[in-house]
């Protein structure tokens, strides 16, 4: 164990000088004597000086303080002891319920599974949310991104998915709160507690008031815990809210580490940092990790380097649209922009595929006709186009759905719609079976039977 001393502090970045024969390796964890702070080595600058990122506040630190090299990377508790607990980036409990009592700790920097160990699957994961199951179905062991600007419903959608999947799914889940609001983390904890699934969930939080070092590493902490469950042969769910903040934390420290910024001020290592995280989120022959990640889209611009880099790693992308939210249609998923590699007749079967493509065709055609309607009015359309517009408006409304987690706001009870009912409902609308019903009957209902019942009351 060599020891050194602090020679420079710039915000979250600290330079430490060690004897030349005892320079710590990159990613080693260092402890500051007399303070609770842990540092992680990022660069070796030469002459025995290393540049580190602080995993915690640097207030009260000063030059000359002694620093001890732990000789290993940051390690966190893994295994069953983490279930039902809330931890920080270093694996310390923050729920005031005593020590974790883990039997094993793993380092947070690990290699991705080799190509030979990886396993792919085509099994569908039913979410109970109509628009997602229809247009961008999730794969078991796949990676899903929820893309959306500020305030279009990423976290509410994430909570509903967690409720529907984690409660219906009997396995373990890990939730990593990366740079999000503490209130949301709190809501999530109580949601899990009330649903009696807390004993199957490990929670790791590095919220937005924490230093960038914590936000940069907390995703890896959560992922390490998920990998342990996977390697024990379980099917694990990994929820990350929000991947963008992980990128942003890297941006915050990048300039302080002395790197030249690249496009839009992001770190030059953006693609590599994202790849290191995403390549580890994968399924092996032992078990699977199904991950659902919220991705904040700055200024609603999907071509921003951060969301654009994330796109490449995903199996399904759920794009939330402000235009759809402004119509009062929730979940505000854009059925024309959202995609999934599962949307293939060989995987999901012809009926599902034809229905999904039919819905997209009708909505796309309606989008094209909107300009004509705005200028000339509905009367100028041909009979077939009038019929198509009427069906498109019904489909648009039928894509909305009351959520369980939003019952407190909406006052209407949540609905879980099975894939079979979803396909039956949309294919019925496309065939014209429900042309006689008013379009408001389709708004905020679960299955098509409920729309028929609602129409009787209108």
Swiss-Prot record:
Reaction(s) the record says it catalyses: ATP + H2O + 4 H(+)(in) = ADP + phosphate + 5 H(+)(out)
Protein function: Produces ATP from ADP in the presence of a proton gradient across the membrane. The catalytic sites are hosted primarily by the beta subunits.
Similarity remark: Belongs to the ATPase alpha/beta chains family.
CDD domains tied to this protein: ATP-synt_F1_beta_C, ATP-synt_F1_beta_N, F1-ATPase_beta_CD
EC number: 7.1.2.2
Listed GO MF terms: ATP binding; ATP hydrolysis activity; proton-transporting ATP synthase activity, rotational mechanism
Protein name per its UniProtKB record: ATP synthase subunit beta
Annotated residues for binding of ATP: 148-155
Organism: Pseudomonas putida (strain W619)
Localization of this protein: Cell inner membrane
Entry membrane topology: Peripheral membrane protein
Gene designation: atpD
Major subcellular location class: membrane
SUPFAM superfamilies: C-terminal domain of alpha and beta subunits of F1 ATP synthase, N-terminal domain of alpha and beta subunits of F1 ATP synthase, P-loop containing nucleoside triphosphate hydrolases
Pfam name, any one: ATP-synt_ab
Keywords: ATP synthesis, ATP-binding, Cell inner membrane, Cell membrane, CF(1), Hydrogen ion transport, Ion transport, Membrane, Nucleotide-binding, Translocase, Transport
Highest taxon of the lineage: Bacteria
InterPro entries in alphabetical order: AAA+_ATPase, ATP-synt_VA_C, ATP_synth_F1_bsu, ATPase_a/bsu_AS, ATPase_alpha/beta_chains, ATPase_F1/V1/A1_a/bsu_N, ATPase_F1/V1/A1_a/bsu_N_sf, ATPase_F1/V1/A1_a/bsu_nucl-bd
GO CC terms: plasma membrane; proton-transporting ATP synthase complex
Subunit structure: F-type ATPases have 2 components, CF(1) - the catalytic core - and CF(0) - the membrane proton channel. CF(1) has five subunits: alpha(3), beta(3), gamma(1), delta(1), epsilon(1). CF(0) has three main subunits: a(1), b(2) and c(9-12). The alpha and beta chains form an alternating ring which encloses part of the gamma chain. CF(1) is attached to CF(0) by a central stalk formed by the gamma and epsilon chains, while a peripheral stalk is formed by the delta and b chains.
């Amino acid at each position: 164990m060599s020891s050194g001393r602090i020679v420079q502090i710039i915000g979250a970045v600290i330079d430490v000088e060690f004897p030349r024969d005892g320079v710590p390796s990159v990613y080693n964890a260092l402890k500051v004597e007399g303070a609770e702070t842990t540092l992680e080595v990022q660069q070796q600058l030469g002459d025995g000086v290393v540049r580190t990122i602080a995993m915690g506040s640097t207030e009260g630190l000063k030059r000359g303080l002694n620093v001890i090299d732990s000789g290993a990377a940051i390690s966190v508790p893994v295994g069953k002891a983490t279930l039902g607990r809330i931890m920080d980036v270093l694996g310390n409990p923050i729920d005031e319920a005593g020590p974790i009592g883990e039997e094993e700790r793993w380092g947070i920097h690990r290699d991705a599974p080799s190509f030979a160990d990886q396993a792919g699957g085509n099994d569908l994961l039913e979410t109970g949310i109509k628009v997602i199951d229809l247009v961008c179905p999730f794969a078991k062991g796949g990676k899903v991104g929820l893309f959306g600007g500020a305030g279009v419903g990423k976290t509410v959608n994430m909570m509903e998915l967690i409720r529907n999947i984690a409660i219906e799914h009997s396995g373990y889940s890990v939730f990593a709160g990366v740079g999000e609001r503490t209130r949301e983390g709190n809501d999530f904890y109580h949601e899990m507690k009330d649903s009696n699934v807390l004993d199957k969930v490990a929670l790791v939080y590095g919220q937005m008031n924490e230093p960038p070092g914590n936000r940069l590493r907390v995703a890896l902490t959560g992922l390490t815990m998920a990998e342990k469950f996977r390697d024990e042969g379980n099917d694990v769910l990994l929820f990350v809210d929000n991947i963008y903040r992980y990128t942003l934390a890297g941006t915050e420290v990048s300039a302080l580490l002395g790197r030249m910024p690249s496009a839009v001020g992001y770190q030059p290592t953006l693609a590599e940092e994202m790849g290191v995280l995403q390549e580890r989120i994968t399924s092996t022959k032992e078990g699977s990790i199904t991950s659902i990640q919220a991705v904040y889209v700055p200024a609603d611009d999907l071509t921003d380097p951060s969301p654009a880099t994330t796109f490449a790693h995903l199996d399904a992308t759920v794009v939330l649209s402000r235009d759809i939210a402004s119509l009062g249609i929730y979940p505000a998923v854009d059925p024309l922009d959202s995609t999934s590699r599962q949307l293939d007749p060989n995987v999901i079967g012809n009926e599902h595929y034809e229905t999904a493509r039919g819905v997209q065709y009708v909505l796309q055609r309606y989008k094209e006709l909107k300009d004509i309607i705005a200028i000339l009015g509905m009367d100028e359309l041909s009979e077939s186009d009038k019929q198509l517009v009427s069906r498109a408006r019904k489909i648009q409304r039928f894509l909305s759905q009351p959520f369980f987690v939003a019952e407190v706001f909406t006052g209407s009870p949540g609905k879980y719609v099975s894939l079979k009912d979803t396909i039956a409902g949309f294919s019925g609308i496309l065939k014209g079976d429900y042309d006689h019903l008013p379009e408001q009957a389709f708004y905020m209902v679960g299955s098509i039977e409920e729309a028929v019942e609602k129409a009787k009351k209108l």
